[in-house]
Amino acid sequence: MENKSNSQILFAEAQQYIPGGVNSPVRAFKSVGQEFPRFIKFAKGAYLYDVDWNKYIDYIGSWGPMILGHCDDDVLEVIQCQVKNGLSYGAPCKQEVDLAKKIIELMPNIEQVRFVNSGTEATMSAIRLARAYTCRNKIIKFEGCYHGHADEFLVAAGSGALSLGQPNSPGVPEDVVKDTLVASFNDMESIQALFEKYKDEIACIIVEPIAGNMNMIFPQDDFLAKLRAICDQNSSLLIFDEVMTGFRVALGGAQSIYNVKPDLTTLGKVIGGGMPVGAFGGRKEIMQKVSPAGPVYQAGTLSGNPIAMTAGIKTLEKISQLGFFDELGAKAQKLVDGLNEAAKAYDFKFHAKCLGGMFGLFFCSDKIAVNTFVDLGKTNLKMFNQFFAYMLDNGVYLAPSAYEAGFISIAHSDEDIEKTICLAKKFFQEN
């Protein structure tokens, strides 16, 4: 009789009570061909510990928020102090003001900000606001860019550059997504064609400035600046979805690196220090349309709750310290350089890249350009699954999808990075 692990037993039990046994699909490990996910017992620093007491070097960091590492002592201390004063008030609190001021200080393109509870709420609200501000209905998103699970975003590209979006999840009415247009990332021709056809109907373009849900694809040939220009030419708004990249690739987000000013920005992950939070902000004249200042309705029972705000304030204080992003970026660069050198040593078709505390792994030669969602689909996804399984079995916890970026924290040590490189080198040698 097979001895099952505690994770296997828990997963079987979870499936009786939770659809698919998880509360977010990627966590089931199905996309990487695994029979069961690892159930986590606790986390500290750069490590996860599962219910079978296996220890993992964690390169997911709760999908991005844990830039300081798990259970940072300073963040824990302020949360514990706040808990004694209440978990949620359903009323304004000083912490909301303090976190808003800090975000605006670090991201000057944001003049006012509204807090919500998730990245999905942030992007959904930003789209509603853009439509109200422009008095237009259509939006442009990019194939492969993920902006949460709101109906208007669950759209795949139809055939041809001018195709209207089609739902890619049951339960999403075609009438809901008929105003969602889908273009190809890094392809200005597809954008220009949409504006030519729907010139006075497009409220906004929403884009991940670095496509972290296509592993990690950078904008090419001034792509973001060109999006800014075409929006200006057509009186449309430009929305940067920096839920992933905000305070992760740089202190001022991707917009500070590429020096492109969006009208609206969505945030999440890092700004909550590990607590559930999202935000959208931008030009004051646009944000003043949000209720109660204006007519665009948005609300939330737990929005701006003092626990999340407190964790966010302390996290942003710590990452604002001089040299933080230099050190974080050096860690990511060491990992990426080591992986690339290991692959090159064994002529293994692989390359990695990074920016700030975010990195991407591509199972194809570095001579092959991966600039679009279609390009990513041509990489060796089967080999990624094998790599994932090997690394997991040897104590390295990577994102369980070839389409997801990885994250490093300030808590990762040189030894953690060197162990990761050594394991990858062995895999490259054997495959």
Curated annotation (Swiss-Prot):
GO molecular function, one term: transaminase activity
Gene3D superfamilies: Aspartate Aminotransferase, domain 1 (3.90.1150.10), Type I PLP-dependent aspartate aminotransferase-like (Major domain) (3.40.640.10)
Reactions catalysed, as given in the entry: (S)-4-amino-5-oxopentanoate = 5-aminolevulinate
EC number(s) reported in the record: 5.4.3.8
Annotated CDD domains: OAT_like
Primary subcellular site in the record, as a coarse category: cytoplasm
One Pfam family linked to the record: Aminotran_3
Acyltransferase as UniProt keyword: no
Keyword Plastid in record: no
Subcellular location: Cytoplasm
Spans traversing the lipid bilayer: none
Signal sequence residues: none
Cofactor(s) this protein cannot do without: pyridoxal 5'-phosphate
Annotated Gene Ontology cellular component terms: cytoplasm
GO biological process, one term: protoporphyrinogen IX biosynthetic process
Sequence positions bearing N6-(pyridoxal phosphate)lysine: 269
Alphabetically ordered keywords of this record: Cytoplasm, Isomerase, Porphyrin biosynthesis, Pyridoxal phosphate
Pathway stated in the Swiss-Prot or TrEMBL entry: Porphyrin-containing compound metabolism; protoporphyrin-IX biosynthesis; 5-aminolevulinate from L-glutamyl-tRNA(Glu): step 2/2
Similarity-based family: Belongs to the class-III pyridoxal-phosphate-dependent aminotransferase family. HemL subfamily.
Family matches, as NCBIfam families: hemL, PRK00062.1
Record note on quaternary structure: Homodimer.
Name by which UniProt lists this protein: Glutamate-1-semialdehyde 2,1-aminomutase
Provenance organism: Francisella tularensis subsp. mediasiatica (strain FSC147)
Gene for this chain: hemL
